Regions:
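Nucleic-acid endonuclease domains
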Residues: 1-134
Length: 134
């Protein structure tokens, strides 16, 4: 696992996941562009990197191994809660991270009520785990 110090970028989205993706993309490419909603099988959010933040949906259902196998990304970036650091992980590191710090929830009934796996709110334990491996 490696870390990337992120550049500061004025917030354009209320959604933390969209802001995390935009800040990471700006740091890596210098581009400021609209957040996308492309399918995970179509590739990473920025090159071969899938970018996530706290409370992000990891996968629909609970089979994260199958999700990673179908994923178009080769690496996974977790952007911390204050948008200053991205922890860049391999698929194996991401599997371990998401398994430890993920939780199973349901979509709202208005969205079909399907089961999905999400990352938990960023905690001290999560931060310590990331720092110990970076």
């Amino acid at each position: 696992m490696t870390t990337i110090t992120l550049k500061t970028l004025a917030r354009q989205y209320k959604n933390n996941g969209q802001h995390a993706e935009q800040v990471a993309r700006y740091t890596l490419t210098g581009e400021i562009c609209k957040a996308d909603n492309k399918p995970f099988t179509a590739g990473g959010d920025c090159g071969d990197i899938q970018i996530k933040s706290a409370r992000a949906t990891v996968c629909h259902g609970t089979d994260i191994k199958a999700h990673i196998a179908m994923d178009g990304a080769n690496r996974y970036g977790y952007v911390n809660a204050d948008f200053t650091v991205m922890y860049l992980m391999s698929a194996d590191e991401w599997l371990e991270f998401a398994s430890l710090f993920g939780t199973v929830t349901r979509e709202s009934q208005s969205n079909g009520g399907a089961v999905k796996m999400r990352l938990k709110v960023e905690s001290r334990e999560m931060t310590e785990w990331l720092r110990a491996r970076a």
